[in-house]
Amino acid sequence: MADLKKTPLYGEHVAAGAKMVEFGGWLMPVQYSSIIEEHQRVRNCAGLFDVSHMGEITIKGPDALALVQKLLTNDADRATGDRVIYSPMCYPDGGVVDDLLVYPRGEGEYLLVVNAGNIDKDFAWIQENASGFRVEVSNISAATAQLALQGPRALEILRPLTRVDLASLGYYRWTEGQVLGVHCLISRTGYTGEDGFELYFEAAAAPTMWRNILAAGREAGLVPAGLGARDTLRLEAALPLYGHELGPDISPLEAGLHRFVRLEKGEFNGREALAAQREAGVRRQLVGLTMIDRGIPRPEYPVLAAGKEIGYVTSGSLAPTLGQNIALALVAAGTVSTGGEVEVSIRGRVNRARVVKLPFYRRPKK
């Protein structure tokens, strides 16, 4: 594990007794108490995640918008003012380089937040595509920490720690301001299916911020949460994970991300391939499964219909909120329908599952 990267909060995690695991080249906390307990705390109260392993790349210059438009399938013209956008970033053949968040940082500047295991690849890809554009591309990941405060009590916990009017900050909106005396980019975003905030700030401040936010939220029930709970939370919300629901061989259309593919915006990497897919129809589709028989479906387990293999599980787990075993699966288009039954081969045994509408979980409206 000596070659694995560590976030600025590594010492905090070890001191708290977290179980550390390898993830995308990083040594990260998978859990502190238990995955189920941390999961339920986020659903019912709040959890604080160290997501400093995520990457941050800036694009600055007169041609910044033009380059971002070339890179993204979504329309970067929609990332204006305080609006954050989510987008896949594709290869010319329609496969996915990565999926990311985009923050407009003023005239001619964008912040791209990329997945931890893809930082170097994404940075090289963006630099390659920047040839001929009047831009400066910088990888600021090592200098940037990121915390995610997630759950229905996130606003209640964070509001006393800043003068920023967080209550009026809409979902997928961002602002800047001081939190506990540290300058932060504050974003009302997350990867759990719950309300919450993601904070970006200088890496040196991470240990103090971590300790002080946890202390401030303790009476409200805030706990540190690891990557295990983050994964079960995002799976219940049917949020894709790169390398599972997205990848070089899985297009955004196959993954069900149609609304983030804006063919009408003009040329971008992968547009021709994705336009052809949309016209002809995708060969595969992402579906949700709840297990009828016992057994937890795991990635790459075969999915069958009438005894014939039609696809495979991309992600699967016990869903603590639902008390069921669930999965996302990539299957041949047109072979299943919502409410129908399929089978998952789990260690050579056939287990029945039902095709369900996604997401598995949607947070209650207030």
Curated annotation (Swiss-Prot):
Keywords: Aminotransferase, Transferase. Pfam families: GCV_T, GCV_T_C. Transmembrane segments: none annotated. Its EC number is 2.1.2.10. Gene3D superfamilies: Aminomethyltransferase beta-barrel domains, Aminomethyltransferase fragment, Probable tRNA modification gtpase trme, domain 1. GO terms for molecular function: aminomethyltransferase activity; transaminase activity. InterPro entries: GCS_T, GCS_T_bac, GCST_C, GCV_T_N, GcvT/YgfZ/DmdA, GcvT/YgfZ_C, TrmE/GcvT_dom1. One of its GO terms (cellular component) is glycine cleavage complex. It catalyses: N(6)-[(R)-S(8)-aminomethyldihydrolipoyl]-L-lysyl-[protein] + (6S)-5,6,7,8-tetrahydrofolate = N(6)-[(R)-dihydrolipoyl]-L-lysyl-[protein] + (6R)-5,10-methylene-5,6,7,8-tetrahydrofolate + NH4(+). The glycine cleavage system is composed of four proteins: P, T, L and H. NCBIfam families: gcvT (TIGR00528), PRK00389.1 (NF001567). This is Aminomethyltransferase. It comes from Moorella thermoacetica (strain ATCC 39073 / JCM 9320). The lineage of its organism: Bacteria, Bacillati, Bacillota, Clostridia, Moorellales.
